[in-house]
Amino acid sequence: MTLRETIISAPGIDASPDENQCPSNVPAYIVSREQFRDAARMMKTADARLVAEWATDESHYSSLPLPSGEREGVRGRGFGIYACYARDNEYLIVKTYTPIEDPTFPSITKKFAPAHRFERQMNSLMGVIPTGHPDLRPWIRHEDWPEDAYPLRKSFDASKPMQRVKGEYNFIKAEGEGVYEIPVGPVHAGIIEPGHFRFQAVGEDILNLEERLGYVHKGIEKRFESLSWTEGVKLAGRVSGDSTVAHSLCYCRALEAMTGCNPPERVLWLRALMLERERIANHLGDIGAIANDAAFAFLLYQFSRLREMLLRINLKLFGHRFMMDRIIPGGVIIDINSDGK
């Protein structure tokens, strides 16, 4: 039984197809807020995995008629709650809606462990509340953010600096004889990005490790709202410099799905070539870094040399070491012949 058949035939779940879903080969079904967790249970029973969970502010649609497939009472014209599931090569999106005056929805963390951080992030940035979540401490939002600051809400004004306040993050505490804490970060030696790690230990035995991230949250998602498509793809390509091809392609594929644009086959092959070269370069760098963490510095030097050779070939083929800005909505900006010219 497919995931689509599972959600349609699930007892006690009234799921209706979202006929406006893009891309059309990833079906989406709308359920009531009360049935959102039941749908997760059915996906778990079907051996599906949770790919992602996110929220959207759809309050600005309140004056528009309901789209096809969405029933009165199901869509509250407030926040959209989405969960994407996968099994093998099949994907399915389950969505529900929660009103602005009561932005709650049933947590699916107890069904799918990865939802734990997804839902904490949704709570931090959108202000929706996953009821039944075991840990609703702020994840992305830091203690100097005002209580009512939710950057991904449409009402949030990103044109001026956020007013800062005083606050304190409540780390998990371990108590007992001989228990001590080791704080690491958020500033580290080297060039890695910031992150705070709180170790609790007895002797050399680690009892608990808690990560505190989000120090480089830049408001990128909010920034996309004010950009044109051509500006947006440039921003996407700068989310992570060494993964610029992957991020640019994701942005372009989303636009192409919404507009029904089908790039030519040659464009698809050129994009695939750039993706593979980016993947190989990053794997070479990562393997070398892993070896270096185990004090095998010589292997790091060798893999770094191979990675540099690959990046120099990228420059010759595509005009940029990391192939930044080579992918645009609907196509690519560069072509190569069989001689690589």
Predicted features by range, described:
Residues 1-67, 76-205:
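Terminal low-complexity/charged segments
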Residues 69-71:
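A short, hydrophobic C-terminal helix/tail in secreted or cell-surface proteins
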